[in-house]
Each structure stands twice: as structure tokens, then as C-alpha cells.
Swiss-Prot record:
Organism taxonomic ancestry: Bacteria, Pseudomonadati, Pseudomonadota, Betaproteobacteria, Neisseriales
Ranges annotated as spanning the membrane: 3-23, 35-55, 70-90, 104-126, 140-160, 167-187
Domain of life: Bacteria
Keywords: Cell inner membrane, Cell membrane, Ion transport, Manganese, Membrane, Transmembrane, Transmembrane helix, Transport
Designated name of the protein: Putative manganese efflux pump MntP
Localization, UniProt: Cell inner membrane
InterPro entries associated with the record: Mntp/YtaF (IPR003810), Put_MntP (IPR022929)
Claim: Cell membrane is one of the keywords in the record: yes
Gene Ontology MF annotations: manganese ion transmembrane transporter activity
Protein topology in the membrane: Multi-pass membrane protein
Protein encoded by which gene: mntP
Keyword Membrane: yes
């Protein structure tokens, strides 16, 4: 898998966390140190969950290698549709917590936004990809986008939260479609 495709996946997987960070930033004025710590928690969790999904998918690979491109297409496409639906319906995470939010709640929120990354990890097991590198890219993208989201959220509120979720879904659908079409020989 190309670096460009990995960056698109990382961007798509970071959109849930970015949307939550925008909302959280609008609701809770965090000092820069807490913004950095919160972003690192989200990034670490987002990097670990695709690794867990990849391990599960890797061990299932011999059983489904004949239709692996369909599995990646269905997983990424379904996840993308789910994210788009949440973005349109307003069901995205609402992080309007009180100012004394605990670290456990931050970790739980990070896990909640990274469940999708575990599914992506399963899909990545069926592609030619260095999973450690992919997980690191996903984690770094999430860390940066959460820090940006928390900072920008203070000024812009939740204006872009739903749009970010929708855009992340579009990216995942595009990657899933590209994977399917390239395995079928319809694109280079």
C-alpha cells in the first residue's frame, strides 16, 4: 500500500476523534498542557486499535484470501457509510463534558472513537501493508488532529464536527472502492 493511501486512511480514521475534539474544545477550555496530553491519549489508543484488528485479521487470512479485497471493500465501505450517517444525523460523539473531566473518561472516549480503527486493522491484514508503520501514521495523525480540534474548537464550537465525520466516511469509502477496483484489475 502506498504512503498516500496510508495517509488517507489515517486522515479518515482521525475524523471521529477530530469531531469529538472540536466539540470538547468548544465545551471545555483546556490549557495547552492538557490539550497535548489529551491528544497523546487519543493518538496512542488510535494507534493500538488497528494493531489489535490486524492481528485478528492476519490469523483469519488463510481462510479468506480468495475474497480479501471484498472484505476490505465491505469493511471500509460499511464503516465509511456509518461515519457519513453519523455526520448527517448528528449522532456523532457529543463531548460536552464538565470542566473536571477525568482521565478515565478521556481514555474511554478515545476507545469509543477508535473502535473503527480496529475494523480498519482487520481490513489492513488483507493488504500489503507494514502494520506498525500504518498504526504509527494513524496515531500521529490522530494526535495532531485532536490537538488542532481542541484548539480550534474553543473558537469555532462544533460547527465543523458533523462535516468532519462525513468527510472521514467519504475517505474510507474511497479507499475501500480503490482497493476493490485495483484487485479486480479495473484501475492501476
Amino acid at each position: 500500500m502506498s504512503l498516500y493511501a496510508l495517509l488517507l486512511i489515517a486522515l479518515g480514521m482521525s475524523m471521529d476523534a477530530f469531531a469529538v475534539a472540536l466539540a470538547k474544545g468548544a465545551a471545555v477550555r483546556m490549557p495547552p498542557r492538557k490539550i497535548a496530553a489529551t491528544a497523546l491519549v487519543f493518538g496512542t489508543v488510535e494507534a493500538l486499535t488497528p494493531l489489535a484488528g490486524w492481528v485478528g485479521g492476519f490469523y483469519a487470512k488463510p481462510f479468506i484470501s480468495e475474497w480479501d479485497h471484498w472484505a476490505a471493500f465491505v469493511l471500509l465501505g460499511g464503516l465509511g457509510l456509518k461515519m457519513m450517517h453519523e455526520g448527517l444525523s448528528g449522532e456523532a460523539e457529543d463531548a460536552r463534558e464538565n470542566k473536571r473531566e477525568s482521565w478515565w473518561l478521556t481514555v474511554l472516549t478515545a476507545f469509543g472513537t477508535s473502535i473503527d480503527s480496529m475494523i480498519v486493522g482487520v481490513g489492513l491484514a488483507f493488504m500489503e501493508v507494514n502494520i506498525a508503520f500504518a498504526a504509527a501514521i494513524i496515531g500521529m495523525a490522530t494526535t495532531v488532529l485532536v490537538a488542532v480540534g481542541l484548539t480550534v474548537g474553543r473558537a469555532l464550537g462544533v460547527l465543523f464536527g458533523r462535516r468532519a465525520e462525513f468527510a472521514g466516511g467519504l475517505v474510507l469509502i474511497a479507499i475501500g472502492t480503490w482497493t476493490l477496483l485495483s484487485h479486480l484489475g479495473l484501475i492501476g
